[in-house]
Amino acid sequence: MEQEQGFIDYIEQSIIKNWDRNALTDYKGITLQYKDVARKIAKFHIVLESAGIRPGDKIAVCGRNSAHWAVAFLATITYGAVIVPILHEFKADNIHNIVNHSEAKLLFVGDRAWENLNEEAMPLLMGIVLLTDFTPVVCRNEQLMEAFEHRNVLYGTRFPKNFRPEHISYRKEESPEELAVINYTSGTTGYSKGVMFPYRSLWSNVAYCHEMLPVRPGDHIVSMLPLGHVFGMVYDFLYGFSAGAHLYFLTRMPSPKIIAQSFSEIRPRVISCVPLIVEKIIKKDILPRIDNKIGKLLLRMPIVNDKIKADMRKKAMEVFGSNFDEIIIGGAPFNAEVERFLKQIGFPYTIAYGMTECGPIICSSRWETLKLASCGKATTRMEVKIDSPDPQNVAGEIICKGANLMLGYYKNAEATSQIIDVNGWLHTGDLATMDTEGYVTVRGRSKNMLLTASGQNIYPEEIESKLNNMPYVSESLIVLQNDKLVALIYPDFDDAFAHGMEQSDIEKVMEDNRNELNLQLPAYCQITKVKIHFEEFEKTAKKSIKRFMYQEVKG
């Protein structure tokens, strides 16, 4: 598909065509129809215009997923301003820095995030507006204050017979290369960079979603991924909204219990999530329904009984609402044994590989054609290579170019030149192989690769994937200490204590796990020691562990 219309056309046409359909719902809260969204956008455009905010100015939004978060986003881009989504999980200092670095004129903020912020630390802002009810809590501009106070009067004067579809005429991007979004990375290295997305990237990513799995007007989609991250922004929001779907925002952490309850009520057609959520549901909700010991065995052994396969598939489908065509999993490595189990029972999942800098999609395939352990082929309008003399057998860095790519990092030409070379290839930092059909299999991140004194390259993710399936292991991290491999393990304390175990019992089980794991590993990557971690590892928005925080192991 070639780009025949602008991205804003996508949004405009969807609102007009689906005027009387439900658009955005906060789970157990408000519902906005497409016409309600259009009218709120119109009011915001009046406020922005009256306050002297111009196309190209930056507007930031920081808060949990909600219908009003989506309205703030849409009002910004349809006005021609640049939206700056900020993860609400960021520390206050980081949010202050992002607002200042992006030169945002306005900040839409959730009430919880606002509690921790200091307006004095963001001196460039004209105003700060609460997402809960769009009340301005800080106004440093008299025109902005007047516009907010009189927005209903101004709206009524401009549209005396109410706002109708024929009134919609949003500012269209002047070029596909025009800046639309600055998205600051969460990253595992501790430093946020502003990724600049042109409208070209938004269009290409959303168009690919529709090419792979067309969404129908009225289809239900549950938004679990943080909208402040580009994976959630594209898959859980723009993909569905541009097709007239009805989006539900959970507005809370997507625990297995909340997912089971909400999905049974909403019955979504498309589901996007990070691997951690699927892994927890399979291990804690699906397999134990049979028998805990048998369930764990099923992760490791082939399932030959068709009745067991059908039963397991039915149970897994029920947890996710039974109505979906496909679950799209991305954002972090997927546990190999959980994936093998899903493949065996014919569960409709697919892996999407990408990175923030590609907005985010690089590789993906429909579940019917996806190969085990692969993340699919290069998406349309993207070209992917493996920087290796033998890409089929020797892992090399994934490099890519195409329509999805960012413009660069905002106000950071040096960092841009380090990731995009002179020929336009983006260097992902991920290591992979590619088979003769073009299927890519990610082996690990080059920066995570551990190099031993003997010259062996070790990919910790592959070891962690095995360890995470062992008894009472919740999550793990493999690090190198004095040229020896050490496993940091956060046990599943709740499960262990529920079975009457004490600390000494947990330590013994972890040592048994180490011995069992080493039987499955070559001599050069044997684990010499286990260290128990008593808190969950700190993670990014994509639920990737922040490895840089745990490299110095003591004891």
Predicted feature descriptions by range:
Residues 3, 22-52, 57-66, 70, ...:
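Conserved AMP-binding/adenylate-forming core of the ANL superfamily
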Residues 51, 78-158, 483:
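Structural core segment of the AMP-binding/adenylate-forming
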Residues 33-35, 180-204:
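Conserved AMP-binding A3 loop
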Residues 385, 392-452:
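Conserved ATP-binding/catalytic segment of the ANL
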Residues 19-20, 148-184, 191, 214-220:
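Conserved pre-ATP/AMP-binding loop-to-beta segment of ANL
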Residues 450, 475-486, 514-555:
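Conserved C-terminal "lid"/linker of ANL adenylate-forming enzymes
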Residues 203-220, 227-314, 323:
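Conserved AMP-binding/adenylation subdomain of ANL enzymes
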Residues 269-272, 282-370, 474:
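Gly/Ser/Thr-rich phosphate-binding loop
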